[in-house]
Design a protein with these regions (language model features):
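A short, Lys/Arg-rich alpha-helix, primarily the initiator
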Residues: 1-17
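Residue-level signal for the short linker/turn that defines the boundary of a DNA-recognition helix
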Residues: 8, 19-20, 46-49
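Alpha-helical residues within the helix-turn-helix
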Residues: 15-16, 27, 56
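Short alpha-helical DNA-recognition segment
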Residues: 19-38
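Short, basic-rich loop-to-helix N-cap that marks the start of a DNA-contacting helix
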Residues: 43-53, 72
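DNA major-groove recognition helix of helix-turn-helix/homeodomain DNA-binding modules
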Residues: 49-64
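Short, charged recognition helix plus adjacent turn
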Residues: 67-73
């Protein structure tokens, strides 16, 4: 079975939305700035609810924020 790696466009989306800071996004979705940092770096996979909250904060579909990269092991 292939290992799935979740990638994201959060940093790009933040900059496309008036250079929103990590803290501003964190406040909008109800988490800490450190959580946003970890998600952006790929060190933390958000819950489904948080993933949708982030997409809603940018007013984009979920697949524009998060996507899966397949890696063959």
């Amino acid at each position: 079975m292939e290992k799935l790696t979740i990638q994201n466009n959060i940093r790009r989306l933040r900059f496309d939305h008036d250079e929103m800071t990590q803290q501003q996004l964190a406040d909008k979705v109800g988490v800490t700035r450190q959580t946003i940092v970890a998600i952006e770096k790929g060190n933390y996979s958000p819950s489904l609810e948080l993933a949708f909250r982030i997409a809603l904060a940018f007013n984009v579909p979920l697949h524009e924020v998060f996507f899966v990269e397949e890696r063959h092991s």
